[in-house]
Amino acid sequence: IVTTGSAVTTLEPVVSPEPTPVVDTSKIKLSKKTMNLMAGKKITLKVTGTTSTVTWTSSDESVATVSDKGVVKGIKKGSTEVQASVDGIKLTCKVSVVAKMSKKDFDRFGITEARYVRGKRKVTVRKINFIYLCQKKGYAGKGGFYYTFQFKNGTGKRRYTNRGIKTGSKLSTIKKKYGDQIVVKKCSKKDAFSNMKLVKKNKAKKYTEVSYSKYKIRFFLNSKSKVVGIIVACNMKNIKKKHLKADGYL
């Protein structure tokens, strides 16, 4: 309080503003620098090392879009860059979008047929679209199912999917061809196919799948994340242990 003559002046205390915290931008990281994503699928990118608001952009939204929460969605086959801007810096993830699953993905695997020629068993592989076969034979209907497979230590000529995956391929190659959004699961006793003799013989520990409608391609992987078996199935959920046992595969 300052008194001047009869006047009294009250001085308010001076409050210094809080210093603006300095952000260590070297600690700010983006969860992925590169990404493979299937058209129609989504993967969420995350920024760590800061609490500031992040601004997300895609260099080509016709290929992939990104939401304000970092959710990247594949639109069509191609490449784009998703950028996260925060605290004065920009972080970039290169996104490669692969084509969505279609009937073409079931072209190459074919179907194994055994027949006898002059008393000798002859195994052949028919090059027929798996989906076409299932629809023609009625396997695609309610309650129906069908499957065919190839294992590393099985019999017959080694086959491959329409995107080039075969026994011996790496998990990283599967992700490159089908997208990082695929989920890897552990083999379980509850899962019918995980109990197959060939699954155990090849020491498969886990598997991943890609789907088109009611049709699936499953890749069995060993401890080194290499493909040891491929199963193509229609209405896989209808296939139980009793069916595999009756076919002699358990």
Spans of model-derived segments:
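Short secondary-structure transition/capping segments
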Residues: N162-G168, C234-N235
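Second-shell loop/turn segments in exported
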Residues: V98, R158-I165
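Acidic/histidine-rich, surface-exposed loop or edge segments in extracytoplasmic proteins
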Residues: Y147-Y160
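Extracytoplasmic soluble-region selector
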Residues: G5-M101, K120, I131-K136, G141, ...
